[in-house]
A protein has these predicted regions:
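A glycine-centered beta-loop-beta connector
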Residues: 25-28, 33-54, 96, 104-119, ...
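Short, functional N-terminal and low-complexity linear motifs
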Residues: 22-24, 37-43, 57-63, 128-134, ...
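The conserved cystathionine-beta-synthase
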Residues: 12-30, 37, 82-100, 107, ...
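Tandem CBS (Bateman) regulatory domains
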Residues: 1-7, 47-81, 90-93, 97, ...
Length: 273
């Protein structure tokens, strides 16, 4: 774990507004921020909190709260969910999947020393020699095993507020965008945070089409899992549309990659806990 975690911690004070947090996320290209709480010696402690893009969407925007008047300490998750640096990456995947989170803080003797994301796990599982996802290389159409065929959509003329409410209700991080009956793009939590909240745009009157990612980044169903992981990394995205003969047949996310490993390895994890 210690070899893959990010040791640089982006920390904000608890009185930071949601708009300011979104601006920091956009500036640093981050999906989460730690909320400051230190021990007597000035070290980040487990009693600190974390605020994520998902929190901004589900706990603020979808509920109609004003991002400029809401503070991060009102919505942060605290205490932090942690893992020690000597634990294997597979254990991190189980903790994330079981608790439905994308980030884990790494703690050493109650001091927060790093953070690890679901994207870090996926990259490790795919690229490491003999890694668990490599086992799928010999499977026919491996992306079809991982992708989700039930795809939530939204019309491009609908508002960002409606998109946020749908994401919150369905507990998902993206919506495929429909225009004239065609899938033309994707709107994600990241888009909403960086292009709407951080830009101080009104979610109730900003259209999804104005903030969606276009064109839709696609990958053929016959490509490998490693191809998908690398394309996500190159494009700095968490979702890919999977196509079969140029028709979108599924959606693949970073979480789907990690979930497969977590489910397969669950018996070992339960025996060791």
């Amino acid at each position: 774990m210690g070899d893959f975690m990010h040791r640089y911690l982006e920390v904000i004070p608890p009185e930071t507004t949601i708009v300011e947090a979104a601006e920091r996320m956009r500036e640093k290209s981050l999906g989460s921020l730690l909320v400051e709480s230190t021990d007597a010696e000035g070290r980040m402690s487990r009693r600190s909190g974390i605020v994520t893009e998902t929190d901004l969407i589900r706990k603020v925007l979808a509920k109609g709260m004003d991002p400029s008047l809401t503070m991060v300490d009102q919505i942060m998750t605290s205490p932090l969910m942690t893992i020690t640096p000597d634990r294997p990456m597979l254990d991190a995947s189980h903790l994330m999947e079981t608790n439905h989170v994308r980030y884990l803080c790494v703690s050493d003797k109650d001091e927060i020393v790093g953070i690890i994301s679901m994207r870090d796990l996926a990259r490790h599982f795919v690229d490491s020699e003999g890694g668990p996802i490599r086992d799928l290389n010999d499977v026919y159409r491996p992306l079809s095993v991982l992708m989700r065929t039930t795809m939530e959509t939204i019309a491009s003329e609908r508002t960002v507020l409606e998109a946020a409410q749908t994401m919150a209700e369905k507990r998902i991080g993206s919506l495929l965008v429909i225009e004239a009956g065609e899938m033309v793009g994707i709107a994600t939590e990241t888009d909403v945070v960086r292009k709407v909240i951080a830009a101080r745009l009104p979610a109730s009157s900003t259209s999804v089409g104005a903030v969606m990612n276009y064109p839709l980044i696609q990958i053929d169903i016959n490509r490998t899992v490693r191809d998908a992981s690398r394309l996500m990394a190159e494009e700095r995205i968490r979702h890919l549309a999977v196509t079969d003969e140029n028709k979108v047949v599924g959606l693949l996310s970073v979480r789907d990659l990690v979930k497969m490993v977590s489910v397969r390895d669950k018996p070992r994890f339960l025996r060791s806990t």
